[in-house]
Amino acid sequence: MSTEFQEQIYRHTTASCTRSWRERRGRYLLEGTRCKECGAVHFPRRTVCSTCNSRNLEHCQHPATGTIVMVNICWQATGVHFGYGENIPRISTVIRLDDGVTILAEVTDTELDKIVAGARVEMVLKKLHRESNSTWMYGYKFVVIEGGELGDGE
């Protein structure tokens, strides 16, 4: 087994295979739902619209590009994030996708000075962590494709 991605903390839990299968389209394709009654879009997928309480929803794929709204850089390793190894700093951002949906996601493979509010980002598929049964969990992160600063009022 390769030691390229060694874990610092042993994971005592493993994600449910059934749950992982059910959530795969959201995790890998940014698939959410759109309400057929009021047109509201949601991510992750929902069974009931949070705007009008309708159950008449359809699956929709959100765009893989968006704009950073807010940035949080964590320089301290915390015990809450088991299985993430030495990924310091952890850069969490609030991203508004091009269709208006807002999500929380990490930014990776980008110089710190380019991770600012208003920067354009694009989704990439990355290894997140290794489960206790030695399988890899994949998911989405974002990389900066254009710099920028939000103007006043954003």
Tell me the role of every PLM-derived stretch:
Residues 66-69, 107:
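Conserved hydrophobic positions within beta-strands
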Residues 29-32, 46:
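Residues immediately within or flanking Cys/His clusters that coordinate Zn2+
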Residues 71-76, 128:
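Short, conserved beta-turn/loop elements at beta-strand boundaries and strand-helix junctions
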Residues 109-122:
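Short nucleic-acid-contacting surface segments enriched for D/E, G, S/T with interspersed K/R
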Residues 1-30, 139-141:
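A broadly conserved sequence feature marking short terminus-proximal activation segments
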Residues 126-154:
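OB-fold/S1-family single-stranded nucleic acid-binding modules
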Residues 43, 56-58:
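Short functional micro-motifs and their immediate structural scaffolds
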Residues 34-37, 48-54:
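Short, cysteine/histidine-rich loop/knuckle motifs that typically chelate Zn2+
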